[in-house]
Each structure stands twice: as C-alpha cells, then as structure tokens.
C-alpha cells in the first residue's frame, strides 16, 4: 500500500492558516540533492486532487500539495483580495526554506506557479498543466459561474454523488471522480454538506499576467488535446515566447489532464524532470 500523506499547517504573513499534504519529507535518501516538488490545484479544487499522482512523484524528492486559502482544509477568511493565492505560495516556499522548488500547477494553480517563477528566478522548474489561455470565453464564464454558486446537500453521500469536474470531463474514470469527490466534501455550519472551496473567490478580477520575458527556469506546458480553456494556438504562442519552454499535448484529455490521463501526465513530467541539471540546495534567506 502506498504511503499516505501527512497534513502540515502553517501561518501566512496575514495570519491565515494554510494546510498542505506532505509525502515522504525527510524520508528520501539519494546521492543527489533533490528539489522539493510543490503541487498547486486549480480553482474550486484542493490538494487531494493530486493524491493519485503524488506517490509516483515522491520517489526521489519530497512532495507537497498546498491548499490555497478558501480551499480544501485551509482557513476560509472573510476578506479576499487579488493576489492572495500568489502570497500563499510565496509564504509556503519561504516556510520550506528552499527557493529551488519544482512547481507543478493545474489551471489556476498553473497561473500562480507561473507568476511565482517569473518573480523568483531561483525556481528550479515549472510544469503548467492546461494553463487557461485563449480558450472559449463561454466555457470559461460557465465554469466560473458554476463555481461561484454555493450548493449544499442533505447528506455527504449525496454531495459526493453530485460532485463533477468543471468543465466536465469525459475521460476521467468514475472511480477517480468518486475518490476526489469524497475528499472534496465538508460539513457546513448548518449541518448540510458542501464542497471544500469558497465560491466568493470567483467574483474577484484576475491578477495581471506576469512578464514572460522574466521567466528563466525550464518550463513544461502541458495541454489536453480537447481542452476548451487552452487553445492550441495559445499554447504554441506561449512556447514561442518563452525560450525555456517545451510544449506537449496529451491526447484524449480535456482541461483536467491530471484526472483524464494521469499516467500519461506522470510520464511527461518524469521525462521533463530527468532533463533538469543537478539541483543545488538553494535556501531562502
């Protein structure tokens, strides 16, 4: 049986309690200094969306999956501001005391990872899984609208049964949907059951895009071949603009590549990481 993650909590600069899952920190012994991997979920998701991938990623280095504020088992603050998730990641990397992280983000998490790497050149590598760019605006608006509505259910079982990926996924297995759904439900104060994210975050405007010219680390952009949120043209334009970027497209996958084709995604990440130069222990000051 693969090892289970442990939970870790830390406090941000503004006093918010963040939760992260940790795989094998302090247990990996190799003859190389390996950078920590930090997994970043998309909007309305949580750290457990990475459970089925994290053990395979943690064979040579520790792996952390962060719950952004207002998501998962992190604190749900009353006040919200643009850039809060970016601050969460910056504080988390500071807590790790290692700047040379390998950031792997999906959707919103990819956008946060991209922003961080463009501002912190010690970032060792970046994997952007279906970063939303140039996609169908109607699909994007519908997904944001659906996420902005708070739905609750009478029982936990009903909430798990009604759990869906947004945008809808036609390739994810029913078993994986149910497992992630089970990790995405929480009991509300009124005794009903809802999902582990605060819908109010989806009414905020987007943070300005980072300067891609400032991105220096090796970067892998992964596009689902059927994605409606990252077009082929936008992915190609990104790869042309970022000198350190490599683009791969995974067949039979939509926006949620990590649940549609997890084994293929793992293979692409492993191939990419194998090309990285040897790490050095770059500690935060």
What residue spans do the PLM features occupy?
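Catalytic histidine-centered segment of alpha/beta-hydrolase-like enzymes
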Residues: 253-262, 266
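Conserved alpha/beta-hydrolase catalytic His-Asp/Glu region
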Residues: 154-211
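Gly/Ala-rich beta-loop-alpha elbow adjacent to hydrolase catalytic centers
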Residues: 105, 109, 113
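Conserved serine/cysteine hydrolase catalytic core
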Residues: 187-241, 249
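Flexible "cap/lid" loop of the alpha/beta hydrolase fold
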Residues: 114-115, 124-156
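Alpha/beta-hydrolase fold catalytic core
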Residues: 1-37, 59-61, 98-99, 270-285
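Active-site loop/oxyanion-hole signature of alpha/beta-hydrolase fold enzymes
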Residues: 13-16, 21-27, 52-55, 64, ...
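Serine-hydrolase catalytic-loop signature spanning alpha/beta hydrolases and amidase-signature enzymes
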Residues: 42-52
């Amino acid at each position: 049986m693969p090892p289970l993650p442990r939970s870790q909590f830390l406090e941000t600069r503004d006093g918010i309690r963040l939760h992260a899952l940790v795989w094998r920190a302090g247990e990996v012994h190799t003859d190389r200094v390996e950078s920590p991997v930090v997994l970043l979920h998309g909007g309305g998701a949580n750290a457990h969306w990475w459970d089925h991938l994290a053990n395979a990623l943690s064979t040579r280095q520790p792996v952390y999956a962060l719950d952004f504020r207002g998501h998962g088992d992190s604190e749900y603050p009353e006040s919200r501001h643009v850039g809060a998730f970016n601050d969460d990641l910056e504080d988390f990397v500071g807590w790790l005391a290692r700047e040379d992280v390998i950031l792997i983000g999906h959707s919103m998490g990819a956008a946060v990872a991209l922003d961080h790497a463009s501002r912190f050149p010690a970032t060792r590598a970046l994997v952007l899984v279906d970063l939303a760019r140039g996609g169908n605006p109607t699909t994007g608006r519908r997904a944001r609208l659906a996420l902005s509505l708070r739905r609750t259910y009478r029982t936990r079982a009903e909430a798990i049964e009604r759990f869906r990926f947004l945008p809808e996924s036609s390739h994810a297995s029913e078993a994986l949907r149910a497992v992630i759904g089970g990790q995405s439900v929480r009991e509300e104060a009124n005794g009903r059951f809802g999902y582990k994210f605060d819908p109010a975050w989806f009414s905020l405007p987007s943070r300005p895009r980072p300067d891609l010219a400032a991105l220096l680390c090796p970067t892998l952009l992964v596009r689902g071949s059927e994605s409606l949120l990252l077009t082929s043209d936008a992915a190609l334009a990104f790869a042309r603009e970022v000198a350190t970027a490599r683009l791969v497209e995974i067949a039979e996958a939509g926006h949620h590549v990590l649940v549609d084709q997890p084994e293929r995604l793992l293979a692409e990440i492993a191939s990419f990481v194998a090309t990285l130069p040897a790490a050095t222990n770059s500690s935060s000051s």
